[in-house]
C-alpha cells in the first residue's frame, strides 16, 4: 500500500472550501480564510492541502510503530462515517456521546468496558440461568454501554493520536487530550478555535461529502501504517509511502479562485 493521495478537484467537489456565514466565525481562523463570497467564508485550500498531507503521514507513521488512532465525531452527519472508517482500518472510535473522563479517567472507563465485555459473554451464552425479564435488562445495559463504549472496548489504553470532526462539539475531548499530551488532528471550520489543536486542517466540518472524504483518507492512511508495520516484521506487502504530489500544490491558488466563485454563486 501507499499513503493515500488526493486532488484539489476532490476537495472542491466535496465542498471542503466552504466555511460558515461570515457573521458566524472565529477571528482566530483569519489566517486560514481565503476570502468571502455571498456572505460565506471561503477556506484557503492552499493551506489545507499540505496540512492534510502532513496529517495523513502522521497517522500512517503512528500506526506503523504500533500506535492507536481514535476517531471522534458524534454529530449526526459524522457518526456512521466515523464508525465505518475506524472499523475498516482496525482503529477505534467514539461516535455517540463523549463521556467526561473518557481519557483522563481511563481507569473508571476500563471498569465500564469490563462490564460490557462481561455482558457480551453472558448474552453470547444465551444468558443461561436468567429469567426473561433479567435477560431483557441485561440486553438494555449492554446496548447502552455499547453505544457509548463499543468503539473503544478493544483499545486497551488511551490512544496515541486522535482525529476529530468538529472541535466545537468535541471540546471536552480536546481538553482531555491536551491535559494528557495526546496529539490531535482536527478539521477546523471557520467557526472553530484552532488553538487547542496540535495538527489543524482547515476545512468544512458539516458537509457529509467532506466528512466522508476526510475519513476515507485517514482510514487508508491507517491501513498504510498497518502494511508498513507488517512489512517491517518481514511480511512483504510492497508497502511504500509516496512523497507529496507537487503538482497539486502548484495548481492550488488558480483552481481555488475560479472554483470558489463558481461554487458559491450556484
UniProtKB/Swiss-Prot annotation:
Domain of life: Bacteria
A single cellular component GO annotation: cytosolic small ribosomal subunit
N-terminal signal peptide: none
InterPro entries linked to this entry: Ribosomal_uS2, Ribosomal_uS2_bac/mit/plastid, Ribosomal_uS2_CS, Ribosomal_uS2_flav_dom_sf
Keyword Hydrolase included in the entry's annotation: no
GO molecular function: structural constituent of ribosome
UniProt KW keywords: Ribonucleoprotein, Ribosomal protein
GO biological process, one term: translation
Pfam families xrefs: Ribosomal_S2
Family that this chain belongs to: Belongs to the universal ribosomal protein uS2 family.
NCBIfam families, A to Z: rpsB_bact
Protein name: Small ribosomal subunit protein uS2
Organism in which the protein naturally occurs: Bartonella tribocorum (strain CIP 105476 / IBS 506)
Recorded name of the encoding gene: rpsB
Amino acid at each position: 500500500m501507499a499513503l493515500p493521495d488526493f486532488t484539489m478537484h476532490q476537495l472542491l467537489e466535496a465542498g471542503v472550501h466552504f466555511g460558515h456565514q461570515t457573521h458566524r466565525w472565529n477571528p482566530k481562523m483569519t489566517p486560514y480564510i481565503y476570502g468571502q463570497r455571498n456572505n460565506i467564508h471561503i477556506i484557503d485550500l492552499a493551506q489545507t492541502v499540505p496540512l492534510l498531507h502532513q496529517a495523513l503521514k502522521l497517522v500512517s507513521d503512528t500506526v506503523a510503530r504500533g500506535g492507536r488512532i481514535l476517531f471522534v465525531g458524534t454529530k449526526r452527519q459524522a457518526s456512521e462515517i466515523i464508525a465505518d472508517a475506524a472499523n475498516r482500518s482496525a482503529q477505534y472510535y467514539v461516535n455517540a456521546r463523549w463521556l467526561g473522563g473518557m481519557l483522563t479517567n481511563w481507569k473508571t472507563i476500563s471498569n465500564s468496558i469490563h462490564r460490557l465485555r462481561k455482558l457480551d459473554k453472558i448474552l453470547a451464552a444465551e444468558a443461561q440461568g436468567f429469567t426473561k425479564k433479567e435477560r431483557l435488562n441485561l440486553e438494555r445495559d449492554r446496548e447502552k454501554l455499547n453505544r457509548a463504549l463499543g468503539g473503544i472496548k478493544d483499545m486497551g489504553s488511551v490512544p496515541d493520536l486522535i482525529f476529530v470532526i468538529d472541535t466545537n462539539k468535541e471540546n471536552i475531548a480536546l481538553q482531555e487530550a491536551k491535559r494528557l499530551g495526546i496529539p490531535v488532528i482536527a478539521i477546523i471550520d471557520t467557526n472553530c478555535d484552532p488553538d487547542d489543536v496540535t495538527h489543524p486542517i482547515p476545512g468544512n466540518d458539516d458537509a457529509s461529502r467532506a466528512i466522508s472524504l476526510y475519513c476515507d483518507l485517514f482510514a487508508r492512511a491507517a491501513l498504510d501504517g498497518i502494511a508498513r508495520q507488517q512489512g517491517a516484521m518481514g511480511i512483504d506487502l510492497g508497502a511504500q509511502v509516496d512523497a507529496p504530489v507537487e503538482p497539486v500544490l502548484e495548481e492550488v491558488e488558480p483552481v481555488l479562485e475560479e472554483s470558489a466563485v463558481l461554487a458559491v454563486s450556484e
